[in-house]
Regions:
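Eukaryotic scaffold/interaction segments
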Residues: 1-343
Length: 343
């Protein structure tokens, strides 16, 4: 590797670099040398003069950043077009994401020297400033040209197919599309924050995009689904059947949440289920409890306890009814004793 800057023909050197980059993102079988690619990047970044021994109007590092930005922009736009051609958008997105993410990790490694120098040089006369590593830039382009493009220009087809798959599982027991979990994970991985340490750049992730693009519509989907179902069931089946159905629904929704969602979504899902399946009909459920006690329907009483224990003051409300029932029952039994004196 060169240790001193040498004059370069930028376009020629960059084209050689981009050829390797296309191989990386195309998942081609051709082998390549990591050192060869890294040397090309290093040669560009340290160069001060062009082939004519003149300073370029724009530093080569800036030109390099613009070129890789254009490459990633074109790459992600092409990927989105390939995804939209498929019938199963979820599967197509998942497969493309796996390849793109691993390719971006590799691309980030070969651009390691470029990444390191971003924090050491400041070309104040050029906007925007270079502050994004190759990896961060690649994921931002995925967010912009794939996720947001599918949302804004294709009727949010990706998330719609996910919610349709989940509804199909609720209605028919059809297993949820196995690729959904990868799509959801991508909403977290695609937002990257960087921290710089002496040993290098460390990447972390945030959940804001996940919350905005998946969690919010998912919670709305749960709310709408169970609002409609509870309104239909509460007046068409017995309270005992409703309680049993609600317990099953909540249990399955919790399992689905643990499989698909991030841990921060768990309580939110529970709260939506409680509101639609329990809280709206709490008084109607409580009104039935004393009758269940009187009829010695103890299994149904247990189910009622399990369901109402999920909501605030549910147990206290049941306890008050039970206490009143015991008082009435005891008084009734005592009356049967007549005037018998108790020793």
């Amino acid at each position: 590797m060169l240790l001193k800057p040498e004059p370069i023909h930028f376009d020629e050197v960059y084209q050689n670099f981009e050829k390797y980059l296309k191989d990386i993102y195309g998942n081609y079988s051709e082998s390549f040398s990591f050192n060869d690619i890294h040397s090309l990047v290093y040669k560009i970044i340290i160069a001060k003069m062009d082939i004519n021994h003149e300073e370029p109007e724009k530093p080569f590092k800036i030109q390099f950043g613009e070129k890789i930005t254009m490459f990633l922009d074109n790459c992600t736009r092409e990927i989105c077009q390939n995804i939209i051609k498929e019938k199963d958008i979820i599967k197509a997105y998942s497969n493309q994401w796996d390849l793109y993410y691993s390719s971006s990790e590799t691309g980030d490694k070969v651009c390691r020297y470029y990444n390191r120098t971003l924090h050491y040089q400041n070309y104040t006369s050029f906007k925007p400033k270079l502050v994004k590593t190759f990896f961060v830039l690649s994921l931002e382009k995925w967010k912009e040209n794939v996720i947001f493009n599918l949302k804004n220009n294709y009727d949010n087809i990706l998330v719609k197919q996910i919610l349709e798959s989940i509804d199909n599982e609720r209605n028919n027991g059809t297993p949820t599309n196995e690729y959904i979990i990868k799509v959801i994970e991508s909403f977290v991985k695609v937002i990257v924050k960087t921290d710089k340490y002496e040993s290098g750049i460390v990447y972390g992730h945030t959940q804001q995009l996940y919350e905005d693009e998946f969690e919010t519509p998912y919670l709305a989907n749960i709310r709408d689904y169970y609002k409609k179902e509870s309104e239909s069931l509460i007046n068409s089946i017995t309270i005992e059947e409703y309680v049993s159905r609600a317990l099953t629904r909540i249990d399955k929704e919790v399992q689905r949440c643990r499989y698909l969602c991030k841990p921060t979504s768990y309580q939110k899902v529970i709260d939506v289920c409680k509101e639609q399946l329990i809280i709206q009909y709490k008084q109607k459920l409580l009104d039935k409890f004393e009758e269940l006690l009187s009829n010695k329907q103890y299994e149904d009483c247990t189910n009622m306890y399990k369901l109402l224990s999920i909501v605030k003051d549910g147990i206290n409300s049941l306890a008050a009814i039970y206490e009143d029932y015991i008082t009435k029952y005891g008084f009734k039994e005592c009356k049967k004793l007549g005037n018998i004196k108790l020793k």
